[in-house]
Amino acid sequence: MFTMKKSMLVLFFLGTISLSLCEEERNADEDDGEMTEEVKRGILDKLKEFGISAARGVAQSLLNTASCKLAKTC
């Protein structure tokens, strides 16, 4: 009876250790995924900022040209 309890205790202990190792690996994998999403989001934000600044530059040059032609100072 004692040997049976001892072996069950060892199995429980080993199962607990393997479960905690699996959880650590899963958490490490999830952290990598979050980093990738942040990088993608950062790249998309940079592209968006670049597009907005380019559009502002084009709009400003068009307004300058239009005001020059309206004032007949070109």
Swiss-Prot record:
Q: In which tissues is it expressed?
A: Expressed by the skin glands.
Report the record's Gene Ontology biological process terms. defense response to bacterium; defense response to fungus; killing of cells of another organism
Indicate where this protein resides in the cell.
Secreted
Q: Which UniProt keywords apply?
A: Amphibian defense peptide, Antibiotic, Antimicrobial, Cleavage on pair of basic residues, Cytolysis, Disulfide bond, Fungicide, Hemolysis, Secreted, Signal
- Which segments are removed on maturation as propeptide? 23-39
Q: What does this protein do?
A: Antimicrobial peptide active against a variety of Gram-positive and some Gram-negative bacterial strains. Has antifungal activity against a slime mold isolate. Has hemolytic activity against human erythrocytes.
User: What is this protein identified as?
Assistant: Brevinin-2CG1
Origin species: Amolops chunganensis
